[in-house]
């Protein structure tokens, strides 16, 4: 990729923003060396990797990359036998902990059902060195000091040091508190010089204490003397300190040797966490600029939906739809300067560079982008004072270089093509240059203010005109790209708005040819037609959304009605069964009582009287039971029943659908939300529903309207939404729905991606797709069930 192209498209500014999201110097080093790739497979993998990291951020908010530092030089020094300092060893331990923590973090997410195949592969390369990590942290404290517990010998030596220091201080403090101290000492303090304890003695009393003079004040009036009485104690203290230093060096060498043994593994782990830091920096940057993963194709076309420039404030930038490579291979954007043409040009270029670097791009979901082997850009005014080149010459030098290298795998961006020279000659050159590049099969976006190029798009196949809309009322560009509409200067309208008289403007119009006036009027009508078409589309879209809302409300009311009906049915059935049971118990009780009376010969009761008594009791049972007995006795299905048939269950007088035969005489029947076993003798065949042709919108078998044909997840949290999807698909399968719709909205695409990831692994899902224009488009996934 040409360095000039990266510069004029401000690729390095994107990298500067990306650097802000790295967690370590390792990640920053990766970003600094980032360049766009031209390998299709590598780009697809990089995009998928960034997408997985973005999924982690959506679910967890962050990634545990703290504590990781660039320890590569220290590890290499350990390999060649150099002793590492405590802080260097501590950095190694912290980095080992960070890599181990990152590995556990990703693996825990995978264990909980989150699909992260690429990140899982990355962390699988991390080898835990927990034992070495603990050895270092057990020997070195957080402040970088070797702790007493590093070895028993070190603990003993430091005990000796503390004891010696205590004895020395005690003796010296006794001296400073004596009655003569005020006279002979400059100050009643104990201090240290040359690592030995001393007291400040006035010059004239140097002989009183004896001992060794280690230092004197600037004036020479005070001597820092080590009194003779503590010389031996100070000597013992120094010997202990030498032993301490030797033991510390032994411990550090031991730890350094342990690092050297595992050096290759440590360096491998560092490379993995460096890549992870780099990957998550991309994901955090995508979140910052509200970017999404583009679909990468190898067919040399792009479809950028609502594309934005990443370096412009998203609150003020106007997003545009930019298509190139299918219906046309060249876009010529015409119109006046300061209209936003260059921003559109740079947006195309930087989006391609970002995508080929594995970065998500600031576009809507389902945007597509292709891979270019070369990207050429001639943008901006780059006069060369050293080479005495004018603006035109500078551009032409660059264009000559482009024409030497451009081919069918190239994207070429021309800004103000042919500018800086005679307009007529410049326009002719622009047309010739465009023809040359187009004939090579390159994809081209060019801007110009020459009116001669307005007809270019109409006279060439695979070329289309475009313009950036200009509001003559506010005298400012709207920055909205109008594909298919060439630009116009608006000079007369702007002049009139600024106060130029109609007489002068009319005279100016007379100087323009009739053909030019006709072209300008035609362009004005095209702009107006496009605005009207867009307004009509927006109105139609609003009506469609209103219709969808009414449809959902109707579905909700139907569900509530059926639920209430089924609830009442269940309640009535339960009450009926309770009454039947109560009547039966009462009858049995009376009969038992009569039998006992007869046995006791307390009453002359015959069997036929018992039967009559039971009949009278049964006559008191609810009408429901009597109806059931009559129906069971007098009816039998004459039609051979099959699963899917619609029947009437005589017990309840309700229609149901046969699910499966559970025995020779019983079927499992679905009645509303109820599923129950019913005998064949207690049902009446109605019909066999015809197999209707499957439509784009899901239909329902039988009459089960209790499960909605669509599930609305908009506004739901990610975890709640996934739980609702799982339950909804189970309910839809029980209701034998062939097809349902899941509304997730467009938004950032997180919910959509989560839904579709879940659908891929659901055993009950046959296929799924996005909704058509009338079904909700990208905001809806239509699911076909098995």
UniProtKB/Swiss-Prot annotation:
GO MF assignments: ATP binding; ATP hydrolysis activity; ATP-dependent DNA damage sensor activity; endonuclease activity; mismatched DNA binding; ribosomal large subunit binding; rRNA binding
Residue ranges of domain Smr in the record: 711-786
Keyword tags: ATP-binding, DNA-binding, Endonuclease, Hydrolase, Nuclease, Nucleotide-binding, RNA-binding, rRNA-binding
CDD domains named among the record's database cross-references: ABC_MutS2 (cd03280), ATP-synt_Fo_b (cd06503)
Residues that bind ATP: 335-342
Enzyme Commission number(s): 3.1.-.-, 3.6.4.-
Keyword match Nucleotide-binding: yes
GO BP terms in the entry: mismatch repair; negative regulation of DNA recombination; rescue of stalled ribosome
NCBIfam families linked to this entry: mutS2
Family from the record: Belongs to the DNA mismatch repair MutS family. MutS2 subfamily.
Record's function text: Endonuclease that is involved in the suppression of homologous recombination and thus may have a key role in the control of bacterial genetic diversity.
Record text on subunit structure and interactions: Homodimer. Binds to stalled ribosomes, contacting rRNA.
Protein name: Endonuclease MutS2
UniProt source species: Bacillus thuringiensis (strain Al Hakam)
């Amino acid at each position: 990729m040409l360095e000039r192209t990266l510069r004029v498209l401000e690729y390095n500014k994107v990298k500067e923003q990306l650097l802000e999201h790295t967690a370590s110097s390792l990640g920053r080093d990766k970003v600094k060396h980032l360049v766009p790739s031209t390998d299709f497979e590598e780009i697809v993998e990089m995009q998928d990797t960034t997408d997985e990291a973005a999924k982690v951020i959506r679910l967890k908010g962050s990634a545990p990359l703290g504590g990781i530092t660039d320890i590569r030089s220290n590890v290499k020094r350990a390999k060649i036998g150099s002793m590492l300092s405590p802080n260097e060893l501590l950095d190694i331990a912290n980095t080992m902990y960070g890599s181990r923590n990152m590995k556990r973090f990703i693996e825990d997410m995978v264990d909980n059902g989150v699909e992260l195949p690429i990140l899982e592969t990355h962390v699988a390369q991390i080898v835990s060195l927990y034992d070495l990590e603990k050895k270092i942290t057990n020997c070195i404290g957080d402040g970088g000091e070797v702790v007493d517990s590093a070895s028993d010998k070190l603990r003993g030596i430091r005990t000796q040091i503390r004891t010696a220091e205590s004895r020395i201080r005690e003796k010296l403090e006794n001296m400073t508190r004596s009655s003569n101290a005020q006279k002979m000492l400059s100050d009643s303090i104990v201090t240290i010089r040359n690592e030995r304890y001393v007291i400040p003695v006035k010059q004239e009393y140097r002989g009183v204490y004896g001992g060794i003079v280690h230092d004197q004040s600037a004036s020479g009036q005070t001597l820092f003397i080590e009194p003779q009485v503590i010389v031996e104690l100070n000597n013992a203290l120094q010997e202990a300190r030498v032993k301490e230093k030797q033991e510390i060096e032994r411990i550090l060498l031991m730890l350094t040797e342990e690092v050297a043994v595992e050096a290759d593994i440590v360096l491998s782990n560092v490379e993995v966490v460096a890549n992870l830091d780099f990957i998550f920096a991309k994901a955090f940057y995508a979140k910052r600029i509200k970017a999404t993963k583009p679909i990468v194709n190898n067919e040399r076309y792009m479809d950028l939906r609502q594309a934005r420039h990443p370096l412009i404030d998203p609150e003020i930038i106007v997003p545009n739809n930019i298509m190139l490579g299918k219906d046309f291979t060249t876009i010529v954007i015409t119109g006046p300067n300061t209209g936003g043409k260059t921003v559109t040009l740079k947006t195309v270029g930087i989006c391609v560079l970002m995508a080929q670097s594995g970065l998500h791009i600031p576009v809507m979901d389902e945007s597509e982008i292709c891979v270019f082997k070369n990207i050429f850009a001639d943008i901006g005014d780059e006069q060369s004072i050293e080479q005495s080149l004018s603006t035109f010459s500078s551009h032409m030098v660059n264009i000559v270089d482009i024409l030497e290298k451009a081919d069918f795998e190239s994207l070429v961006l021309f800004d103000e093509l042919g500018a800086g020279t005679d307009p007529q000659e410049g326009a002719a050159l622009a047309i010739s240059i465009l023809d040359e590049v187009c004939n090579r099969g390159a994809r081209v976006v060019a801007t110009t203010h020459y009116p001669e190029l307005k007809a270019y798009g109409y006279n060439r196949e695979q070329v289309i005109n475009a313009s950036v809309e200009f509001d003559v009322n506010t005298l400012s560009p709207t920055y909205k790209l109008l594909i298919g509409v060439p630009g116009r200067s608006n000079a007369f309208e702007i002049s009139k708005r600024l106060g130029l008289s109609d007489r002068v403007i009319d005279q100016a119009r007379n100087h323009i040819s009739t053909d030019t006036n006709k072209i300008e009027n035609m362009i004005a009508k095209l702009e107006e037609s496009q605005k009207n078409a867009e307004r009509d589309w927006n109105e139609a879209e609003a009506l469609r959304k209103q219709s969808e809302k009414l449809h959902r409300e109707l579905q909700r009311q139907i569900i509530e009605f059926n639920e209430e009906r089924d609830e009442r049915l269940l309640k009535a059935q339960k009450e009926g069964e309770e009454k039947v049971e109560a009547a039966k118990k009462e009858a049995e009780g009376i009969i038992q009582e009569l039998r006992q009376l007869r046995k006791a010969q307390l009453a002359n009761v015959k069997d036929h009287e018992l039967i009559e008594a039971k009949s009278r009791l049964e006559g008191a049972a609810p009408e429901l039971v009597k109806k059931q007995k009559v129906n069971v006795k007098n009816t039998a299905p004459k039609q051979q029943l099959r699963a899917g048939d619609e029947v009437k269950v005589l017990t309840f007088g309700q229609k149901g659908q046969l699910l499966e035969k559970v025995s020779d005489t019983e079927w499992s029947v679905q009645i509303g939300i109820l599923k129950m076993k019913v005998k064949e003798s207690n049902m009446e065949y109605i019909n066999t529903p015809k197999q209707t042709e499957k439509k784009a919108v899901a239909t329902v078998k039988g009459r089960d309207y209790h499960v909605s044909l669509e599930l609305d997840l908009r506004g739901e949290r990610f975890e709640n939404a996934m739980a609702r999807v799982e339950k909804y698909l189970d309910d839809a399968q029980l209701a034998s729905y062939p097809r349902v719709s899941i509304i997730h909205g467009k938004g950032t695409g997180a919910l959509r991606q989560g839904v579709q990831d879940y659908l891929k692994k659901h055993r009950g899902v046959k296929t799924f797709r996005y909704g058509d224009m009338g079904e909700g488009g990208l905001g809806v996934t239509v699911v076909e069930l098995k």
